[in-house]
């Protein structure tokens, strides 16, 4: 995978990148709203959207959010959202390479930990995260103004 590049998501790559998440989760993103909100998201230093490109094709996506803690040592921590690899490119270490990028970013910021949520039915994702050293904790999610997943 020498041709694999992990980089910050660019506006011109939005549709291709978001399509991976939408396809993996059988969703439809509101692109009009996304394009209107993108500059606000892109310019927020606490948001870091990345893509994995293989031969200039987007094959992975992740949103990394810096959270600023107010207790103990006041170290920041990261949350990872919207993580996904295109189904045709899984089991090729692309997700692992993306997480290596995330680890380097966390170390640069001197983060205390990284948190993420895997949907309860996403057994493949859970096994992948466990293979990277993550362990299960109890987490809760409340959807606001939406139907249950």
Segments predicted by a language model, with ranges:
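Conserved acetyl-CoA-binding loop-helix of GNAT-fold acetyltransferases
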Residues: 82, 91-104, 131
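Conserved GNAT acetyl-CoA-binding A-motif
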Residues: 99, 106-117
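Conserved GNAT-fold acetyl-CoA-binding loop/helix
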Residues: 19-40
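A short beta-loop-alpha structural element at the N-terminal edge
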Residues: 2-17
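Conserved beta-strand in the GNAT
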Residues: 51, 57-66, 84
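Conserved beta-strand-loop-alpha-helix junction that forms the acyl-donor binding cleft
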Residues: 115-125, 143-147
């Amino acid at each position: 995978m020498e041709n694999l590049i992990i980089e910050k998501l660019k506006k011109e790559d939005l549709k291709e990148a978001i399509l991976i998440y939408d396809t993996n989760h059988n969703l439809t993103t509101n692109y009009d709203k996304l394009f209107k909100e993108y500059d606000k998201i892109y310019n927020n230093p606490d948001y870091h959207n990345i893509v994995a490109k293989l031969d200039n094709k987007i094959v992975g996506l992740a949103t990394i959010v810096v959270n600023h803690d107010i207790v103990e040592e006041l170290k920041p921590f990261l949350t990872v959202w919207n993580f996904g690899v295109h189904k045709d490119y899984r089991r090729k270490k692309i997700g692992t390479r993306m997480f290596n990028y995330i680890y380097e970013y966390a170390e640069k910021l001197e983060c205390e930990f990284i948190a993420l949520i895997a949907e309860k039915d996403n057994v493949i994702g859970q096994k992948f995260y466990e293979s990277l050293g993550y362990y299960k904790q109890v987490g809760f999610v409340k959807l606001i103004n939406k139907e249950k997943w």
